[in-house]
Amino acid sequence: MLVAMILLAVAAYYFFYSNLFKGTNTVSHAITNQGIVEIHPFAVSAESVGLHSFATGTVFVEASDDGSCVIRIVSQLEIDPEDWGGVSFSMPGHLTVKQLTSSYPEDGTLDEIAGWPATWISTDTEQKYKTFIEIGRDRGHHSTRGGKGSVLIEMLSVPNMPIPDSFPIGISIGGYNKNGYDVMGAEYITIPITFKERE
């Protein structure tokens, strides 16, 4: 009798759940790091000039099936209220910005947040970097409000433009006065990208 009751309970359980989830996908498997060929963590600060400004994050390099290159930069940053230099991300000419998402300053209104990222494109053919994304930088060299935030930058290789086997991405931070001259980029790091399409 006990065995029969157990079998009946198991059968009822199976019947109930098989009908409950019938036709549905109960398990989802996200593909992790699909196409990623390089990962570069970074950290840079302006403490050397007495500013509490820093940026940390990761650069992800993706090789697409068509041979193109996708680069995503995810960064957490904090900018000193006395720092007019902010943070700048510099890219070579074969990359174009697809998406720029920022929460800096995270305690600001949506209008304030939208007003802080700036993208500059140089026409100088001799310059190593062509595109500059600046967060919290005042080109009038006036102290900003400072604050914290997160930044997501997505860049794509320009169609029909050759992708070098290796190229740099630059990140600078801080603005200060040196010998009477205002200097943008108190500290600067270069991230070497050695892009290679994977089979």
Language model feature labels by segment:
Residues 64-110:
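Low-complexity, serine/threonine/proline/glycine-rich extracellular segments that form mucin-like
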Residues 23-82, 187-199:
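Serine/threonine-rich, low-complexity linker/repeat segments that form flexible spacers/stalks
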